[in-house]
């Protein structure tokens, strides 16, 4: 585990109700979820996290839960200058009213990002989601916000799907691909060429290595060094409570070492993207 102070570019706050995921009994897999700012700050202090981008927790198929956490992240950003926040928004047409209200908060102090996912429904290719996506990116451009998209193998979160958003919107909006593709297929597609092709094409694409399979951070660091680009596009993220801070930090530190690349990913890239 790294002993340096870190900046965490993607973590969550909010305790969700138990839910019977995948047909099982109601559970709370995110067992370290935090309900209060005091609990969150205690975690930051224990970890040595100097600054953090905090986002509403999500995962249960009830959009109102995550939208309800928008006020919590705004309060966190207002009360502690170590914390910036992102607002939960949704591409689903049935959530359009709640998304519109959330986007009205984009100019509030401390708001640096918008967070969304297709895990709860919708698709990049669904025409009924297009108006919401256009609105999200219009607001992101207006307020210079970073749009965070969940990526993982399969279905609507696959990098082949989410990557279409980089192609369409990445020229003039910043996009953070959370979890670097989320699995082996996404890692290989991105590291072998796609991530670097986007950068060379002028796309404003960023990512992190949370949830990454063991080989990926090593290979990514090696390709960045070999190609000489991408060092300013990767940020450390714990994804707490769905990720594990200690594990994520140790894996990235092992891949990047204690030199310039490690410093950029653990600290400086966050400052460049989100300000001091």
Language-model features and meaning:
Residues 50-51, 60-154, 201-203, 276:
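Active-site gating/metal-coordination segments in enzymes
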Residues 37-44, 70-74, 99-103, 133, ...:
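Generic structural signal for well-ordered alpha-helices
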Residues 12-14, 57, 88-92, 117-121, ...:
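Active-site beta-loop-alpha junctions enriched in small/polar residues
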Residues 22-31, 61-65, 123-127, 184-190:
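Short, flexible/disordered intra-domain loops and linkers
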Residues 2-9, 13-51, 141, 229-235, ...:
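Mid-to-C-terminal alpha-helical segments outside catalytic/metal-binding sites
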Residues 125-235:
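Catalytic pocket-lining loop regions of alpha/beta-barrel enzymes
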């Amino acid at each position: 585990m790294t002993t340096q102070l870190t900046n965490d570019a993607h973590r969550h706050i909010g305790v969700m109700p138990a839910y019977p995921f995948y047909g099982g009994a109601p559970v709370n897999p995110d067992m370290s979820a935090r309900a209060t700012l005091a609990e969150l700050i205690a975690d930051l202090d224990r970890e040595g996290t100097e600054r953090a981008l905090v986002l509403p927790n999500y995962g249960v198929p009830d959009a109102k839960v995550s939208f309800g956490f928008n006020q919590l992240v705004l309060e966190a950003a207002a009360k502690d200058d170590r914390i910036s926040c992102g607002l939960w928004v949704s591409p689903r047409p049935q959530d359009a009213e709640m998304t519109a209200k959330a986007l009205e908060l984009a100019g509030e102090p401390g708001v640096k990002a918008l967070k969304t996912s297709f895990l709860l429904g919708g698709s990049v290719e669904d025409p009924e989601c297009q108006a919401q996506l256009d609105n999200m990116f219009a607001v992101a451009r207006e307020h210079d916000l970073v749009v965070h998209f969940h990526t993982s193998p399969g279905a609507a979160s696959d990098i082949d799907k989410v990557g279409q958003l980089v192609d369409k919107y990445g020229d003039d909006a910043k996009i953070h691909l959370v979890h670097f593709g989320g699995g082996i297929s996404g890692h290989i597609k991105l590291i072998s060429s796609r991530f670097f092709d986007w950068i060379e094409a002028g796309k404003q694409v960023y990512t992190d290595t949370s949830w990454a399979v063991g080989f990926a951070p090593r290979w990514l660091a090696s390709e960045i060094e070999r190609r000489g680009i991408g060092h300013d596009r990767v940020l450390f993220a714990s994804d707490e409570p769905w990720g594990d801070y200690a594990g994520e930090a140790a894996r990235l530190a092992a891949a990047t070492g204690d030199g310039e690349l490690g410093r950029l990913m653990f600290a400086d890239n966050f400052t460049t993207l989100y300000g001091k």
